[in-house]
Amino acid sequence: VSAELPVLPSAALPSRRRSVAGLLATAGAFLAGCSGNSTFFQSTPTPQTQPQTTEAPPPGPGGTVGAGEVKAALILPVSATGNAGIAGQAMRNAAEMALAEFNAPNVQLLVKDDAGNTDAARQGAQQALDEGAAIILGPLFAQSVSAVGQVARARNVPVIAFSTDANVASRGVYLLSFLPESDVARIVQYAGSAGKRSYGALIPDNPYGTVVEAAFRQDVARRGGQVVAIERYPHDKTGMAGPVKNVAQAATRVDAIFIPDSGDVLPDVVQTLTANGVNTKKVQLLGTGLWDDPRIYSVPAVDGGWYAAPDSAGYRNFAQRYRARYKQDPVRTATLAYDAVALIAALVKTQGPQRFSPETLTNPSGFSGIDGLFRFRADGTNERGLAVLRVTSSGAQVISPPPRSFGSSI
């Protein structure tokens, strides 16, 4: 399998950049479209926060991967405790796999283990830059991304990071992660195209909910819709009763109810909603990628609900190859590290001295990776080409495939 990651051609780009797709096609096709959208460890859908540590250890001995001329830092919490460390190791494995599957990569990864610590991430970035890194991949957590971004900006070196907190994105600090704003934009767009104009919403009362609520209000208004009722609820049955009842009372005046929550909580929310007289066969339920969870597929009242997420075909293929190589399942975020490494290897091979320039990285035609189309905006956030799926008792079914290309706006 080749890990060539093609840049999609754009008529607006200089001919050298338009040629990238053709050059990579001759080297071998890269997996496009993919992803399951399970959440980060199926955990609470808040922007990723790092483990608390009392003092900053020096960056761990991450080592190097590859022997190419172009050096790239890879900063991950490999030795962190709990899920953070599991994610860090899996992402390091995926990065190694990307280089192994790429056709003659001219890249060397300088792996820096930050143990989930902000100061260690900063020190690791400084070390990597002193060792000649031309780009930084990672870190995973928002505070560390901010710290690394400051170091990199002073040296005019770009960062491709993995945090889900869009607040840490900026010029030169690009987020490759799954941003909840993309899920919201896609599901509202599809619902509007299906004739849904009036909406209710039940939003979890956590940082993820704050981000999603703002995006939802903005996207509904942009498409000429109306939010009739919206409530925030805590993650306990007693506390959610009042907010759910308030939205249920407005159910006869809405076309759809948006509930962006995970399999840990969504079944209780929907059960409370139906107990208050809402017929979910008459009111369309909408969700985000957090719905990509077998626990949700088994809830009868959610059957027929729509949600936005990457098409899962590519992720399944990636996971199969990962299991064959490492004898264990990858975490969901592993594809981010794979795509980041495949991207820079492709750019090194095709883009010459401009390989990591802002113009190259923000190519409006975007790139195609394990999780489908993506592109970086100038402000550091990203846009992804997502599918819309329908919940069924046998799993999710794609009802609107991801786009084959991006429009001109970015």
Language model: regions and residue ranges:
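Extracytosolic ligand-binding ectodomains
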Residues: 2-23, 34-410
